[in-house]
Regions:
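Polytopic transmembrane helical bundles with strong interfacial aromatic enrichment
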Residues: 1-129
Length: 129
C-alpha cells in the first residue's frame, strides 16, 4: 500500500480528534484562535497529502470524498479566525461531521451507494479488460 495513502488515512484520524478537542475547548474555555488556526492548517496539509496520494495510487475514489473534505476545510477556515463561541462550535462541529462522512464514503463500513456512484479512477490507474 502507498505510504502517502497510509499517512493520509492515519493523519486524518488524528485530525478528527483534534477538531473534537477544538470544539470542547471552545465550549468549556472559550475560543482559542491559535489552536483553531493550527488545526485548520493541519487539515489543509492532510488535504494536500490526500491529493498527492490520489495520483500515486490506483485505488478508486468516490467524488464525494474530496467534495465533503473541501466543504469541511472551508468551514474550518471560516471558524478558525473567529472569537465568537457559537460560530466556532457550529463551524468545527459541522466540519467534523463532514469529515466523518468523507471518511465513510471510502471506508469498508461506509454506504455501498457511494462506492458505486461518482467513482473516479486516478490517472495512474491501469484498467484491465
Amino acid at each position: 500500500m502507498n505510504p502517502l495513502f497510509i499517512a493520509h488515512k492515519h493523519y486524518g484520524s488524528l485530525l478528527l480528534l483534534l477538531i473534537l478537542i477544538v470544539v470542547l475547548v471552545a465550549l468549556f474555555k472559550g475560543p482559542n484562535t491559535k489552536l483553531q488556526r493550527i488545526v485548520a492548517v493541519l487539515v489543509d496539509i492532510n488535504l494536500v497529502v490526500g491529493i498527492v496520494a490520489f495520483f500515486q495510487t490506483a485505488r478508486p475514489i468516490s467524488w464525494f470524498h474530496p467534495i465533503l473534505a473541501l466543504a469541511a476545510v472551508a468551514l474550518l477556515h471560516i471558524g478558525a479566525k473567529s472569537e465568537d463561541k457559537s460560530k466556532v462550535v457550529r463551524c468545527f462541529s459541522l466540519a467534523l461531521l463532514l469529515l466523518v462522512a468523507a471518511w465513510a464514503v471510502n471506508a469498508s463500513w461506509g454506504p455501498e451507494w457511494f462506492k458505486l456512484n461518482f467513482v473516479k479512477l486516478p490517472a495512474a490507474a491501469v484498467i484491465v479488460k
